[in-house]
Amino acid sequence: MDSRQKTVVVVGAGFYGSVMAERFANELGWKVLVLEKRDHVGGNCWSAPDPDTGIEVHTYGPHIFHTSHELGWKYLNQFASFNNYRHTVWATRKGKVYPLPFGLAAINLLLGRRLSPAEARAWMQAEVAREGIAEPRNLEEKALSLIGRTLYEAFVKEYTEKHWGMKATELPAYIITRLPVRLTYDVGYYNDRWQGIPTEGYGALFNKMLAHPNIEVRLNSDYFSLRNSLPAHGLMVYTGPIDRFFDYKHGRLGWRSVRFEKQVLDIEDYQGTSVMNECDGDVPFTRTHEFKHFTPERTFKKTVVFREYSYLPGPDDDMYYPVRTTADLAIHAKYIDEARRVPHVAFGGRLGVYAYLDMENTVSTALDKYEELKNSIVAGRTGA
């Protein structure tokens, strides 16, 4: 690939693909063809006003943008303004409600005590020491080594097993990298400097991002139905499932998916917060979402509620969470080797790299990859 290359095909119009499309069109002046199999852009981050209530509903589950990286924040603010929403998460456990992540409020409510920060720290250290786990072999042992048994059994075990559809002792330890604990009464979920929801919704953000005249967006367009009509060695940004790109030749990668049951209720407020985790194993859904709370600057007389259910997806279902067992990672390593043999294709996004990425990471990795590709193009080297 060299500087004569003037066209790029982008497969998927989520954050990764949309950032790439915007950068190639706006900065390099290239023609960009975006192929999106759904009937809208935005991927799983898409949101749109509910026709019955006017409430902005996140079709594929809540997405709260949060970052401490100024570059990504400034980049997205070209296409949207954000409100001042600050995310909180609450959890229901045996009929009682607790704030997450773990902090003084949750610990003291659970124990029925009034521990100071120092006392809570000593209590947690004793909890962890009691387990005596130096080298965790699975998710359960990893969690016990971080927070101890009391918090784990109250808030993590049943919720995690419900979400993943597996026993915590069967899940790999690296699914949990950390379990944040704040020994304060701060119940804000994120620590990032910038947080919020686009004031006009994610749909408007993506539409503006892709509005450049050099960008052609084709909706309802499955790449795999069109691939034989595309240039064989033209530059491509691919954000679909990496295993499908290579026709599952090394096997399928493991995923979990979620589905949502929607209710429109003729009341002003259903649960008093945007997200409620359901920690009890006998409750079939994992979370309850109430979207009006994402826009506290607006008022509505009705409300929209989603109940979230986790399940093992079929081959045609949407993939949400990579399982990444040892077997999955062995398969993925083979696909990484395959990807190196197609240097004109840049794999990115959650599906393309088989990793869970939040929006901030997706935007920042797309911007970084674009700079890498741009530099390769200018130098006349292979770019992906």
Q: What spans do the regions from the language model cover?
A:
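N-terminal Rossmann-like FAD-binding beta1-loop-alpha1 element of flavoenzymes
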Residues: 6-34
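Short, solvent-exposed loop/turn segments at secondary-structure junctions
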Residues: 14-17, 39-41, 105, 161, ...
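Active-site/ligand-binding neighborhood in enzyme catalytic cores
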Residues: 94-99, 104-235, 239, 246
